[in-house]
């Protein structure tokens, strides 16, 4: 499969207009700081799990959790390193390490990483029973694509039905594959497209979701994909990516 050329990650998306370096830098800082919340939430969730008597008795599970904590710390470190690359950050760019990856492994890693985050938010995470074939390959940066999915799962956990279920599914669409996250909450509302604008929030304003969705949109478009969503009953948010079924 062909790789893609380097693309801009932080750029003018959903009305985010940055005219000068001075204007751009605070917005980049807010975007990156927002992304640091997910790994820290994961670590908090794992810490609670480690404190349980059941995990204390299960050596194998305890080692697995410690491994996930290390992975979350590595993700935090990568974000910090990229933030330190001042010249790239000031230009609104971040490096992407592209390569082919199996869709099944991307989904599996995402579910494993997001499980403690959902437990922390009292939500149930599962692979959709109506999911299409989770086969084939996409080309991209594994770290950033997983970050996109975890962002969508985190938003579903925040704004979905309390104690509800979050379902991750896929659907093949010709030479593209759609990856989507559904919940059983109240839907996205009539102005769903506006949620991809910076600093937008859902009806529940306890935590902002606009920064996360803005970054998800930018990353997806850098992979030559597009955002997808459905509001109302059975609502979901997802994205498509170029896909090879082989």
Task: Name the predicted role of every residue range.
Residues 212, 216:
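Short alpha-helical Gxxx[C/S/T] motif in the catalytic ATP-binding
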Residues 91-96, 137-140:
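Conserved micro-motifs of the catalytic ATP-binding
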Residues 71-76:
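Short alpha-helical segment of the dimerization/phosphotransfer core of two-component systems
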Residues 188-199:
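Short conserved segment of the HATPase_c
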Residues 117-128:
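Short conserved segments within the C-terminal catalytic ATPase subdomain
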């Amino acid at each position: 499969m062909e790789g893609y050329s380097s693309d801009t990650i932080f750029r003018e998306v959903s009305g985010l207009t940055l005219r000068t370096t001075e204007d751009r830098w605070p917005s980049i800082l807010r975007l990156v700081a927002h992304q640091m919340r997910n790994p820290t939430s994961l670590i908090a969730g794992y810490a609670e799990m480690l404190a349980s008597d059941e995990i204390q008795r299960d050596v194998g599970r305890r080692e697995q959790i410690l491994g996930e904590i290390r992975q979350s710390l590595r993700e935090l470190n990568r974000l910090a390193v990229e933030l330190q690359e001042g010249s790239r950050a000031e230009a609104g760019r971040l490096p992407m390490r592209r390569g082919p990856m199996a869709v099944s492994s991307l989904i599996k890693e995402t579910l494993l990483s997001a499980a403690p985050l959902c437990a922390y938010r009292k939500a149930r995470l599962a692979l959709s029973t109506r999911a299409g074939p989770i086969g084939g390959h996409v080309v991209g940066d594994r770290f950033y694509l997983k970050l996109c999915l975890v962002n969508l799962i985190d938003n579903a956990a925040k704004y979905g039905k309390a104690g509800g279920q979050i379902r991750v599914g896929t659907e093949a669409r010709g030479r593209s594959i759609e990856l989507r996250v559904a919940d059983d909450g109240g839907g996205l509302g009539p102005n769903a497209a506006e949620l991809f604008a910076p600093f937008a929030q859902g009806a529940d304003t306890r935590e902002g979701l606009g920064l996360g969705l803005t970054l998800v949109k930018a990353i997806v478009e850098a992979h030559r994909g597009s955002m997808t969503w459905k509001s109302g009953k059975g609502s979901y948010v997802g994205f498509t990516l170029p896909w090879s079924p082989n």
